[in-house]
Amino acid sequence: MEQNLKTIFYAMGAMILAPQTLCAQSVNIEGLDSLRLSGSVSVVEPELLKKGVLNNALDALSGQTAGVNVTTNGLDRIAMLNSVRVRGTTSIMGGNDPLVIIDGVTSDVATLATIYPADIESFTVLKNASETALYGSRGASGVIQVKTKKGTGKGFQISYEGNYGIEAMYKSMEMLNAAEYIAAAQKYGLEYNNKGYDTNFRKAITRTGNIQNHYLAFSGGTPQSNYRASFGYIDHNTIIRSKGYRNLVAKIDVTQKAFGDKLAGDFGVFGSSFKNNDIFDSQMLFYSADAMNPTYPYDKLNGSWVKNGAASQVNPPGAVLKERNDTKNMNFNAHLKLNYDMTNSLSVSAFGAYSYASNENNQFCPTWVWAQGNLYRGEFKSEDWLANVSFNYQHSWGIHNLKAMVGAEYQKDIRTGFWTSAKGITNNDMYYHNIGAAASRPFGGTDSKYEDPTLASVMGNVDYTLYNKYSLSVSMRGDGSSMVGNDHTWGFFPSVSLSWDMKQEKWLRSLKEITMLKLRTGYGRSGNLGGISSYTTLNTVRQNGIVSVNSSPTVTMGMISNNNPDLKWETRATWNIGADLGLWNNRLVLTAEYYYSKTTDMLYAYDVPVPPFAYDKLLANLGSMSNQGLEVGVSFTPIQKKDMELNINMNLSWQKNKLLSLSGEYDGMQMSAADITAMGALSGAGQHGGYNNVVYQIVGQPLGVFYLPHCKGIIEDGNGHYRYDIEDLDKNGTVDLSDGGDRYIAGQATPKVTLGSNISFRYRDWYLSLQMNGAFGHKIFNGTGLAYTNMSSFPDYNVLKGAPEKNIVDQNVSDYWLEKGDYLNLENLTLGYDIPIRKGVVQSLRVSASVNNLATISSYSGLTPMINSYVVNSTMGIDDKRTYPVYRTFSLGLSVQF
């Protein structure tokens, strides 16, 4: 059923960013033919993808649909995406990144980030288990389907898109300058080093950044035989000196029909080369730039870096900039799909794909920063073969419509890696290019790996519609994996969904105000193998030393994991119910959906006794976790005229996560993890001693809560210094700052509510768009403020303006530095103009100007509240001296169609 929706709206079950006209309610399953879903599919106009300069393809997805969170790396915001989360965290160890399918080929978020944004025709995000169950053991964390542009068959066409932007820092830490530093030291009678300079180290390590994107595409042919080729280039010099990346992408697609259009073939080739130049220790760089004595010089003096021997946790920022952490990623993919219509109702489809990826990582830490220096080089490669075949049947008779599919699939990966490290550098000029000249190689610093997992699958789907208004969809997928235990080789993942198109009822047809009204519900199960490797079910060993045997050096081996033949898939079961309402020819569209999911057989590494176990950790399926939420989408077009149009779109997502259990029985033995376990702490540069655990996993609570002492205020210690007044919560007469002591649950790191919004206005050939996103209901621990206000480290380490007046000499964590993380970010403002031209060689011409990261509205006192609030690791919810400088991007764009 074709839908040509003029307005823009967000569906909760699946979301598509695509042109207005497409076959709604269908998804593509890795090269298999499209299947009708009784869940909802929404159309978002291409204008919403225009965000000025896009670093990568997933920038276009950020904020566009409820329940999908795209976050940049907590260390920087240059380009590479650290995570994508679909309806939150569903596992501790099993992995939480969604499955990515690019033109039917299994992929990942990292590969998607290398695709040129203008090459993408549509995103489809599957969130409900009734859809993700079609992907079986890989769909538990959601699925992002990407369809790239193909030839149109409308004759020869050329298109060019280009953007150029500059980046300017507009917010940084306000540290003491040289005069303020000297005055504060003299005020308190402290000895200090004065080198006679007044250096702003943050300014010294930054620059005006620039980014340019260029994209050229050719297409031609007829509807029966057509092609499309495209080339993209991104060059980004960031605001941090010596940091930047380049991405080169090429893509070719050919489509051919034959035998009276009964046979259709699609062949595509994709390749990309991504080079990234980075710093090895960004936290060290930013902390050194902030905390370095401002009377010290930035550059070398007499050929040597000037270091403060009393400040062992910092290094001259110029020296830290000499560190290297460079990567080079190469991706290649080729796929072929053939579809043959055997009859009017029956077709057969075959799909094959080959993917190759290589990653080189080279690291260099000079002796100016590390005592002996450090070198590392590693190379990792992967090859993936994917093949499937399916039979598709479709038949309509009277009031009935039936679609069915059965298929089989086989996938094999080969993953290899080699790496080596060395120290004892005698010459810093060679960087990592002469690793053989290093004096020593740490034991265990050279290693390699090999994995070859396989996955075989069978699947089927039946979709039945009655009266074109009642729909039932049932699917089943069985996956057999080489990575799980022998007793659990096969996992089965069913789903069922129902929908009711109420607008088709006679009693609603007469209500012209209602354009669309649909109810839907579904239940399904999907799996997750992310926490299991090829050899996890086996006892594994590695070298742990070298001894002399008969005067010959002999490597000794030690156990590094226990075998667990009972390992199996994590399983996520999801139930959802939702509704879609369109009024006044869809000028107002409302969508809402509630979902509840539960992950069982959740993987966790348990402490076990030795003996009877050979190793002190065991990976087992004993835990469980739940997620529930409500997602609401609103689209409103208050003005819709020939020369003027205004669209307002918003999506809201409420989410609640809960860690249900980490205990159970394994082989007759009761196992349980600690109810309270620290996940993240203040550490590294500038944090010396103290009880510094901040974020915890606690059974019965959301994953990632702040478990902190309560600070009643600041008190004087009698010496003119001030300390945090910690409350004795258990009233036993002493204050215990350790885990389980005088601590309480003070909030959660993950937002309870997220928001995405797009407002677009068109007047004749001019258009203006504003895109916003926000997060609410969570907290951030301002570890940067704690460290930079601590006067016990002064004057060895510089402090924030205002810190000398407070004179706090305490670094223990408490809720004093726990702040609301709520924010509303004005992500992009774009003004564009479609230049009127006479139709000739040039078919269309558009120019635009954009500002990215326009402003952030927040009460948070740190640099930015947009830190890692979603990825479960040691940085979750903690602002700990890692914050990348806040900058804006101003860009100009040009789009030409020939």
Put a short name on every predicted segment.
Residues 1-259, 263-272, 306, 317, ...:
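Short, small/polar-rich motifs associated with maturation and membrane association
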Residues 96-97, 209-212, 247, 253-259, ...:
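Extracellular/periplasmic, surface-exposed regions of secreted and cell-surface proteins
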Residues 100, 299, 464, 705, ...:
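Short aromatic-centered micro-motifs
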Residues 159-196, 419-421, 620, 637-747, ...:
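Conserved small-residue
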Residues 733-734, 767-827:
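C-terminal beta-barrel architecture of Gram-negative outer-membrane proteins
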Residues 748-780:
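Glycine-rich, aromatic-lined ligand/substrate-binding cores of catalytic
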